[in-house]
Amino acid sequence: MKFSEMPYQRPDLDAVKQQFADLCARFKAAESYAEARAVFLEEEKLNKHVDTQAQLASVRNTIDTRDTFYDEEMNFWNEAAPQLQECQNAWSRAMLDSPFRADFAAEYGDLMFVNAEIADKAFSPAILDEMAQENKLCTDYGKLIASAQIPFEGGVYTLSQLSPFKNDPDDARRLAAWKAEGAWYKEHQAEFDGIYDKLVHLRDTMGKKLGYEGYTTLGYYRMGRNCYTKADVEKF
């Protein structure tokens, strides 16, 4: 199946949240590893389906940010994603506390528990509103980047379409392309600065709400860094 043929349907958020809650309850009530494993596979299937719909909306919105249908879908996902993250966090906690943890680790490896512990440090219901605001700002940034229409040598190009000219063998042409791109960024400097400033303050607030000194520690956790730390990076 081609990507363009993959069906998209906005999920019923309340129904999906209830499905996750039911799976979590069943998982906690499991009396054997076989029973817990069966619920685990159900949760994986549901999670993959929901994530597929989210990714379809995101990619198709990126392909054409002027598409009003997927623009509306991104508005939905910007609000829905933090709520679904709360469901995932509850599931991760159930996995971490499971009496069958050793059985899961024996079959699937311990990495998923390492990642679950990291994810648990990166989330709290206290930052749900900030997460939704962050998603909207990131969407706004993507729209701004996609809106670029840069005049160059009689044509009009997007940022990606201008890239070949920036790598042209001719020095003068390369320089002109870089200057054309720079002029566009300069023209929209206030918009970029506004998004950046809001994100910095928003993420700093998120980090502090979770008990960290700022965003850096939270940022490492959110990126799922499981094999090196901020201290390791500072050595370089």
Segments (PLM) and residue ranges:
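Alpha-helical coupling/stalk and coiled-coil linker elements that connect catalytic or binding modules
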Residues: 232-236
